[in-house]
Amino acid sequence: MVAFYKSFSAYIQSITRWELLTFLFILLMIFCFIKRDLSSHIEGFEQSDKYKVYENDSIYDSFYADIYDELFIQPNKIEAEVDEIINITGVLNNSDNKNKNFKIGDLGCGRGHHVHELTKKGALNVVGCDKSNAMLQNARDLYPKCKFIQGDFMKPMLFSEEEFNVLTCFYFTVYYVKDKRAFLRNCYQWLKPEGYLILHLVDRNHFDPVVPGGKPLFIVTPQKFAKERITNSLVKFRSFQYKSDFTAPPPSSAKTGEKNVGKFVEKLIDDKTGKVRENIHTYYMPTNREMLDIAKEVGFTITGQVDLVHVLNEYQYLFILKKVA
């Protein structure tokens, strides 16, 4: 699948602008029919208030868990990330994997897709951790043979010292964490010597904040053809409309706004009642350099970086942090 996306991306770059626009128009029509069919089973949200606001942890209830994949999941990206974990850590060739002593933990596992993919490809001791009971219930329903626990990874006692060979933190999870130093210190404590933390980070000023569900088949980013960065998304479900907008942290020279704090705001509007559910995600987004400097101060060595452009996620990266013995 990853190889297909590489080849397809090369093909897209080779055709003329008019050919590309025609191709995208056809794909958009196909996408609209597919999306309408895929989202037909999603029921509308129910609330007594005309306008209700959810923030951070409270957002991840059963309704949001049910629509999450429609908005955010990219199977090719998950597969690519798991392949990178396997290649970097050598888990499948490690003798400890056979007796389940090679342990991988996915922090902020959500609906459990990475845990499942790792298990499917041969990692025998993988556990997913998330704070949201609703997301974990979805994960357990989807993947009953995988292991999941509910917990807050900001609590040092959640896991034992030197329990894991590998920890992962994907898809903006780290940006919900205000105290990055405490988070990295916990990870360092839980890792065995020579263990890895694989961390998803983005270039906050250039990554594409349009949700995957709002892009036709994930073929090409509209940012390439926009004069200004597109920050808003629109997805139509059967009985409600989804809108989102991302506001990047202000520049360091700005006189207003909180340093390193961005906002991702979602609005879900019921077609019949007009009631609105607003989700406010607060992202604590230091620059990648600032983040990696903190990691070094905690004790990590930065051993590598994977650019996710090959799965059409430009300006998004996996950084490989190692606890050197």
Residue ranges and their predicted role:
Residues 1-12:
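Short, low-complexity, Lys/Arg-enriched N-terminal segments of secretory-pathway carbohydrate enzymes
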Residues 20, 25-98, 113:
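Conserved class I S-adenosyl-L-methionine
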Residues 105, 111-156:
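Class I SAM-dependent methyltransferase SAM/SAH-binding core
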Residues 158-166:
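A short acidic, Gly/Pro-enriched loop at the edge of an enzyme's catalytic core
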Residues 165-179:
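A short SAM/SAH-binding and catalytic strip from SAM-dependent methyltransferases
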Residues 181-196:
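A short glycine-rich, Lys/Arg-flanked "PGG" loop and its adjoining helix->strand segment in the class I
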Residues 199-292:
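SAM-dependent methyltransferase
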Residues 284-325:
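C-terminal lobe and adjacent flexible extensions of AdoMet/dcAdoMet transferase-like proteins
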